[in-house]
Structures are given as C-alpha cells and as structure tokens.
A protein has these predicted regions:
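Active-site/ligand-binding surface loops and adjacent short beta/alpha elements
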Residues: 9-12, 16, 187-189, 196-273
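Extended, loop-rich substrate-binding clefts of extracytoplasmic carbohydrate-active enzymes
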Residues: 24-25, 29, 38, 103, ...
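Glycine-rich, pocket-lining loop/helix-strand segments that form or immediately flank
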Residues: 66-84, 109-130, 207-229, 288, ...
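Beta-strand-rich N-terminal accessory domains
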Residues: 4-116, 254-275, 319-330
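Acidic/His-leaning functional-site neighborhoods
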Residues: 42, 120-134, 205-206, 234-311
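Acidic, contiguous internal or C-terminal segments within carbohydrate-active enzymes
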Residues: 37, 44, 48, 147-190, ...
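Hydrophobic residues embedded in beta-strands of well-ordered beta-sheets
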Residues: 35, 44, 141, 174-176, ...
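Intrinsically disordered, low-complexity Pro/Gly/Ser/Thr-rich segments with frequent PxxP/GP/PP motifs
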Residues: 310-321
C-alpha cells in the first residue's frame, strides 16, 4: 500500500495532458504518479513509483524549461526505468559488486540472478522498487522504502533495512537528505548515494578537486588507485569529451560544479560526509554525463582490507545513518 499524505494543492498526478510545467514531455504523455515541487520559478518532479527517482529539476522561463538535470523521457516513464530518469537513489550500496557476490559475516552473500542484464550486481535494490510518499508540502516531499528479504527471490538483498529521502527546494537549490536504518538483528554492510545525469553539450565543463582516480578493468571494476590526467583536468574544468570515464575518484572536496559557459550558467553540488567518493561517468561518443556523490567506491564489499580507501560501512542492528546532498544553480 502506498501511504499518501499530500497537501491538497500539490496532488499526485497521473495525467500529464494539462501540465504545461512538464512541457518537455509529449503533450499526450501518461506517466506514473508524480509529485511536483515548486519554489518560485523552480520545479522538481519526483517519480516515487519509478525507484524513488527525480524525473526533472528545472527553472520555468518564458522561453521554456531550463533543465539543471537531464529530464526523463517518455520512454523512461513507459518502461518505469530509473536509469533514464534525471537522478535516482542508491541503497544499500553504490555501483557494481564483482560477480554479484562477496563475503560477509562468515558466509557468502550471493546477489546473482536478480537482473540478468548485468554480470555484476548494480546500485543496490532500492531503485528497482516503488517508494511510498510521506509528508508533502508545496516545496518538499518525503519518500520511504522498506526492504524485507525474500528467500524465494534469487539474488535478493539478505538484510532488512529502511531508507528515506527528503527532497526539498529552498529557493532554487535542491536538497536531498538521504537516510537509512538497519532493521535486522545482525550487522549489515552498507553504502548510499544518488545518480544524477546532467545535460551534456560540447561546451560543458566539470570542476572538482580530486586527488587520485581508481583505474578500472573492462568490467568497470577498480584495479588500483593512482594518478590520471583527468585528476588535473577536473581541477581546471574538464570537458566530458576529454576522456572516456566511468571511474571513482578519491579525496574530493565534496564539492563539484557542472558548468555550461556558453549558456552562462552552472550547477554546484555539495555533499556531507560520508559522501567521500565521487564517480564521473562520461563515456565517449555518448550524450550521458553523471557526476555522482557516493559513500563507497565500486566493489567496496570485496575490498575489506582497504576500508579507509573504499568507504562504505557496517550498520549495527538499529543503527541509522543520514547525510544531505545539495545542488545550487547559478546564472550569469
């Protein structure tokens, strides 16, 4: 059952036909139930049923929607695909786990079989399920997801936990507070993050103060931490076309800026600890660009002897963790 507790002036909507605010979609579009947050001219469209994802974050202007994140397409709604939303939450780990298995608590955690599209477990399980809607105002909404292991489902995450997002507009800035609690009676390995996609143009630049990069193999799994020309490029404003990247970066300052200098605007993302790791996904000859704040590197659960370098943590029974991400736009 979905728990819907909404301000009447901000109802969940399913028929987008008359919503001119969502004009980037076809005027005949039908989407899952959405929540639209407003603050002045800024809008955030949330798709609870599509993995608790953000569908869009934009400013409404006389010329149309000015998007700060890549907006979801109609196909993303049709297929309920979080991977094609504007951003989606990552619980209870970020990125890949090699061969979908790792050792923990004296046994093997086998996550294989839950998604045959991927050879390695990917992004946890919260993005694969609908989220419940909690308290909602004109400018904020709370989303909740609770996972109980299903022994009959191959590759199901074998630990019980609760996750929450509080998504809020403050002025033009977007705040996403993420939290989780171990609801089980045994320790649980854990990590979290968000997976934002940004508009990518020929003039886009990414700024981030990072120290080293995790080099990766053909399966995009980390092999070693070391120098790379992208480290220096990010400090001075890296073009997404400069390298073919799908890599973790270490020791970032928890601040990154995506700039569109030809459009005279930029978006700065800041993160609380323990979002101490940064992923940059900028594939060659592709329109995608992600700059992702995460608490753990790829395959961290299989690198138990490198905890300080790979992040992640273990939540004891009943233990909670919380941290906030903020995106602040600027024009001019």
């Amino acid at each position: 059952m979905r728990d819907v507790s909404l301000n009447p002036v901000r109802p969940l909507v399913t028929d987008l036909t008359n919503l001119t605010e969502l004009a980037w979609l076809d005027d005949r579009a039908i989407a899952p139930a959405l929540v639209t947050l407003t603050s002045g001219a800024t809008r955030v469209v949330v798709a609870p049923e599509v993995g608790g994802a953000l569908a869009a974050y934009y400013e409404s202007t006389p010329e149309g929607a000015l998007h700060w994140l890549r907006p979801a397409t109609q196909a993303a709604f049709d297929e309920r695909d979080p991977l094609r939303m504007a951003s989606f939450p990552l619980f209870p780990y970020c990125n890949r786990i090699r061969d979908a298995r790792f050792e923990f608590g004296g046994g093997t955690v086998d996550l294989s079989g839950n998604d045959l599209r991927f050879a390695h477990a990917l992004h946890g399980n919260a993005w694969r399920h609908p989220w419940q809607v909690g308290a909602c105002t004109e400018s904020s909404v709370e989303l909740h997801f609770e996972h109980t292991p299903d022994p009959q489902q191959p590759g199901d995450w074998p630990f019980r936990y609760r996750a929450q997002q509080r998504i809020e507009l403050v002025g033009g800035a977007l705040h996403v507070a993420l939290s989780a609690q171990n609801l089980g009676d045994r320790p649980m390995p854990f990590g979290m993050g968000h997976h934002p996609y940004y508009p990518r143009t020929a003039q886009t630049r990414v700024y981030a103060n990072v120290q080293r990069m995790w080099h990766a193999d053909a399966d995009v799994l980390p092999t070693h931490l070391g120098p790379h020309p992208a480290v220096e490029a990010l400090r001075h404003g890296m073009s997404p076309d400069a390298f073919a990247l799908d890599n973790n970066f270490a020791n970032w300052s928890r601040e990154a800026t995506i700039a569109w200098p030809d459009e005279h605007r930029q978006l700065t993302m800041t993160a609380d600890t323990p979002f101490d790791h940064l992923v940059v996904f900028a594939p060659a000859n592709d329109a995608q660009l992600c700059v992702e704040p995460v608490t753990n590197t790829t395959d961290c659960f299989n690198a138990v002897d490198m905890q300080e370098q790979v992040g992640g943590c273990v939540l004891e029974p009943g233990e909670e963790i919380a941290a906030t991400l903020t995106w602040t736009p600027r024009k001019g």
